[in-house]
Design a protein with these regions (language model features):
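A conserved helix-loop-beta module that forms one wall/lid of the active-site cleft
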Residues: 1-22
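Short, flexible turn/loop "capping" segments at secondary-structure junctions
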Residues: 12-17, 85-86, 145, 228-233
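Short, well-ordered beta-strand elements within core beta-sheets of diverse protein domains
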Residues: 24, 52, 154, 235-242
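Active-site "cap" helix and flanking loop/linker of ATP-utilizing ligase/carboxylase catalytic domains
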Residues: 103-125, 131, 140-198
Length: 275
């Protein structure tokens, strides 16, 4: 009924999963049945959310909450692709959105944290910058995933967010939240076409490139690569850092070009992806 009554486009998703599992864009009414089934299969409780599609750049925000204070630590630009699914293929930190928009997003994030009653600990938010202003996609009582709180933020600032969050959990005041430097850190996923991985080459050479901080592989030769419909099942990641945004992105692209993932025995999904 919600799909019939609400204006298109819409987004349907499970209310109790993670990693964009079961999240899908509905652009036409006839797409609703399949999207409903996919979301239902990904839901632990069977409960779903149908909401407006929010068009615009997406931000990822982290915050620490302690001593009655909300300290927003970092804001990154998320790159979402693979419509009608919502797959994060990477992020760049810090965001290069106008400061005025970042201020509005920060205000909304802090208001949402208070509304949820998160008065101690950590919080992460995904916020869209729409033509009508910032809108909340998700708020959670934890630090961000996707390598942001554990890799890109520490690499860009020198601040260990995980340590700070643990200190708060122990009832202590974080001791080291002041930025030591102001770099740009970039994370991008390695996403081959679907099929069976025959070989992975060039990883050691990629790691030797100046500015490459991490090359992380979650798959190896013999594993299968499926078509990505969520943030689960990626083959690997490259994380880089530099003094400028352009340089950090350039280094990341070079590292990923250095790595060769050879695919054989293509699955039936391969040709859909290529088309």
């Amino acid at each position: 009924n919600a799909v019939k009554e609400m204006p298109l486009p819409l987004v349907i998703k499970p209310c109790d999963n993670m990693g964009a599992r079961g999240v899908k864009l509905i652009s036409e009414r006839h797409e609703a049945s399949l999207a409903f089934r996919e979301a239902k299969e990904a839901s632990i409780s069977g409960k779903l959310i149908v909401e407006e599609y929010m068009d615009g750049p997406e931000l990822s925000l982290d915050a620490l909450i302690f001593n009655g204070h909300i300290q927003v630590t970092g804001i990154g630009d998320r790159i979402i692709q693979r419509a009608p699914y919502f797959v994060e293929v990477g992020h760049t930190l810090p965001s290069n959105q106008p400061q005025e928009k970042l201020n509005l997003a920060t205000e909304l994030f802090c208001s949402a944290i208070k509304a949820l009653g998160i008065d101690i600990g950590a919080a992460k938010g995904d916020i869209k910058l729409t033509k009508d202003g910032p809108k909340v996609i998700e708020i959670a009582a934890r630090l961000s995933g996707g390598w942001m709180s554990t890799y890109t933020y520490p690499l860009a600032t020198g601040v260990n967010l995980m340590k700070a969050a643990i200190e708060i959990a122990l009832g202590e005041t974080p001791t080291d939240l002041k930025k030591k430097y102001d770099f740009v850190s970039v994370e991008r996923a390695i996403i081959p076409i679907p099929g069976k991985i025959l070989t992975i080459k060039g990883v050691d050479d990629a790691r030797k490139i100046k500015g490459v901080k991490e090359v992380i592989f979650l798959k190896e030769a013999g594993d299968s690569v499926e078509e990505l419909r969520s943030n689960v099942g990626k083959t690997g990641y490259v994380i880089t850092v530099a003094k400028t945004r352009e340089e950090a992105i350039r280094i990341n692209e070079l590292a990923r070009q250095t790595i060769q993932v050879k695919i054989g025995e293509p699955s039936e999904l391969t040709w859909d992806v290529l088309r």
